[in-house]
Regions:
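Short, solvent-exposed loop/beta-turn-alpha elements that line the ligand-binding surface or hinge
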Residues: 37-93, 112, 173-174, 199-258, ...
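Compact beta-rich and alpha/beta scaffold cores in large eukaryotic transport/transcription complexes
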Residues: 162, 279, 292-294, 309-310
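Extended, charge-rich low-complexity interaction segments
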Residues: 185-204
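Charged helix-capping and loop-helix junction motifs
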Residues: 285-289, 301
Length: 352
C-alpha cells in the first residue's frame, strides 16, 4: 500500500539518523541531490530551482496559497524558500494519521490479519553488526512511537527485521526480482546531465532497482504545457523523453519526441527543468523510494594553504582544484608556526 509506505517515510526522523550514522551528510528528501547541474552554461543546480523546491514541498504534503506555503497541518511556513528550508521529512502526527489510514485500507482489502507487521530489511553480510543492529533499533523505536501516537484503530505493531544474503550477486538478483520488502541503496551519476536519472534509475526494467515499477509508471499521468499547449502522457513516457527516447518502441503509448517535435538535447532548459521536476514528483508520490539523506564527502582544511574558493562550486570545479591552491607557509615555516603555538591551533582557527 502506498499509504503505508508514505507513513513509513514520515515516521523517520532523518536528522536523528544522520547525526548517528551519517554525520557529514544532510537530510535528503529528493531523488537528486544538490550536485546535479541542470544548466551547465550557468552552473545552476537543479535542487536550487523553484521547480525542484516545489516538487519536494508537494511530496511532503505542503501546499501554496497566495504566495504562502502551508504544511499538512495548515500552518503557514512562509515563502517558497522559507518553507523549503524548514523541511525535515519527519512528522509524527501525520505519520500516525497515515498509519491509521493504511490500516483501514489494508482491512478493507483483506490483506491484514491482525498480527504484527514485520518488514524484512535485506542486506549482504555474514552477521548483524553492532552498527546495523543500532540502525534497526533506531528505526523500530521511531515506528513504535508512531503506533503509540495513533488514536484510531491501527496495526498491532510495525517493525523491521534483518535478512542477510551471503554475497552481492544473490542480493542484487533478489532485489531486481522483487523478493525483498526493504533495502537500503544509493545511486546516481551524470551530475552535469541529470535528465535520464528518473528513467534509468527508477523506471527502466533493465536497469532499475524498483521491481515492476515500469508498469506502475505507465499508469501515472502527467500534463505539461509546451508552447501554449497542454501535453498529456504517462510518467513512463515523459521519463523516456528525458532519456532521449526517439523511436516508438522506446515509449509506452505516446512518442513525445514526435508530439513535441524536439529531442531532449534540443529543448529549452526551462522546459526540461519542468519535465524533470514533474517526473521526480510523480515518482516520489508512489513512495516506492524513501529518500533519507544526501551523502557528502568531508575533508579537513589547513591554515597552511588556501583553496581557490572558500565555497564548493560544483562537482566539476570543487574548491578550485590543485592549480588554484596557494600556500601561506612553506613546510619549514608551518612547522615553526605550529611550534610557536605549542602545537595547539584551536584559538587560531576559532578566531579565523
Amino acid at each position: 500500500l502506498s499509504t503505508f509506505r508514505k507513513a513509513l517515510s514520515f515516521s523517520i526522523n532523518r536528522q536523528s539518523y544522520i547525526t548517528r550514522f551519517e554525520p557529514t551528510s544532510d537530510i535528503g528528501l529528493g531523488l537528486l541531490n544538490d550536485l546535479y547541474i541542470y544548466n551547465p552554461d550557468t552552473g545552476e543546480a537543479y535542487r536550487d530551482t523553484d521547480a525542484a523546491k516545489e516538487t519536494i514541498l508537494k511530496a511532503q504534503d505542503y501546499y501554496e496559497k497566495d504566495g504562502v506555503w502551508y504544511n499538512v497541518h495548515d500552518e503557514a511556513q512562509g515563502s517558497l524558500d522559507d518553507a523549503y528550508d524548514s523541511l525535515t521529512g519527519f512528522d509524527l502526527s501525520h505519520a500516525a494519521d497515515l498509519m491509521e489510514q493504511a490500516y483501514q485500507e489494508a482491512v478493507h482489502e483483506g490483506i491484514y490479519d491482525g498480527e504484527p507487521v514485520v518488514i524484512t530489511y535485506c542486506t549482504v553480510g555474514s552477521g548483524v553488526s553492532e552498527n546495523l543492529q543500532a540502525l534497526i533499533d533506531m528505526i523500530n523505536g521511531m515506528l513504535a512511537d508512531v503506533i503509540a501516537a495513533c488514536d484510531q484503530p491501527t496495526f498491532k505493531s510495525v517493525s523491521l527485521k534483518v535478512q542477510l544474503y551471503a554475497d552481492e550477486a544473490t542480493y542484487w538478483e533478489a532485489l531486481k526480482a522483487g523478493k525483498m520488502d526493504l533495502s537500503f541503496s544509493t545511486w546516481g551519476g551524470s551530475a552535469m546531465d541529470p535528465w535520464g536519472i528518473i528513467y534509468s534509475c527508477y523506471i527502466d526494467s533493465a536497469n532499475s532497482n524498483n521491481f515492476g515499477f515500469d508498469s506502475v509508471a505507465k499508469g501515472i499521468g502527467i500534463t505539461i504545457n509546451y508552447n501554449g499547449k497542454d501535453v498529456a502522457a504517462s510518467l513512463y513516457d515523459w521519463a523516456a523523453w528525458l532519456y532521449n527516447a526517439q523511436s516508438d518502441n522506446q515509449y509506452d503509448k505516446t512518442n513525445l519526441y514526435e508530439v513535441l517535435g524536439v529531442a531532449v538535447g534540443e529543448a529549452e532548459y526551462d522546459f526540461k527543468l519542468e519535465v524533470l521536476a514533474q517526473c521526480e514528483l510523480a515518482q516520489l508520490q508512489t513512495y516506492s523510494n524513501l529518500p533519507i539523506f544526501y551523502s557528502y564527502i568531508t575533508s579537513l582544511r589547513s591554515a597552511q594553504y588556501n583553496n581557490g574558493s572558500d565555497y564548493y562550486v560544483n562537482n566539476m570545479i570543487g574548491y578550485g582544484g590543485i592549480r588554484h591552491i596557494y600556500y601561506n607557509y612553506s613546510d619549514a615555516q608551518w612547522s615553526n608556526f605550529v611550534q610557536g603555538h605549542n602545537g595547539n591551533l584551536e584559538s587560531y582557527y576559532t578566531a579565523s
